[in-house]
Amino acid sequence: KLSKELSRRATGKTLYILDEPTTGLHFEDVRKLLEVLHSLVDQGNTVVVIEHNLDVIKTADWIIDIGPEGGDGGGAIVATGTPEQVAEVPESHTGRYLAPMLDAARSAAE
């Protein structure tokens, strides 16, 4: 279903909501999915992704980190912002794991 929908011509007026789209995908397939999603955004569409994969999270324009735990321990907004901003929030489990990835990417770019 996902590949069929994403292969349609983008109108620039569509809201895409994806729940864990990387589940079961190979790393290369995740990379291809990210290319498609970023292309949809570049064409003016809005893409909302519910995801735990840090390779996807680190490419987001904006993150809403909900937690801090799952189930009864969750449901609160822990952090919002760019990946860099979320990585600076001590209460964010996502930020804690995201920070080293962002640091490594910065070091590789230098």
Swiss-Prot record:
Annotated InterPro entries: P-loop_NTPase (IPR027417)
Signal peptide start-end: none
UniProt GO cellular component terms: cytoplasm
Gene Ontology biological process: DNA repair; SOS response
Keywords: ATP-binding, Cytoplasm, DNA damage, DNA excision, DNA repair, DNA-binding, Excision nuclease, Nucleotide-binding, Repeat, SOS response
Annotated GO MF terms: ATP binding; DNA binding; nuclease activity
Cellular compartment(s): Cytoplasm
Superkingdom as given in the UniProt entry: Bacteria
Family, per entry: Belongs to the ABC transporter superfamily. UvrA family.
Oligomeric and partner information: Forms a heterotetramer with UvrB during the search for lesions.
Function: The UvrABC repair system catalyzes the recognition and processing of DNA lesions. UvrA is an ATPase and a DNA-binding protein. A damage recognition complex composed of 2 UvrA and 2 UvrB subunits scans DNA for abnormalities. When the presence of a lesion has been verified by UvrB, the UvrA molecules dissociate.
PANTHER family the UniProt entry points to: UVRABC SYSTEM PROTEIN A (PTHR43152:SF3)
Name the UniProt record assigns to this protein: UvrABC system protein A
Annotated source species: Paracoccus denitrificans
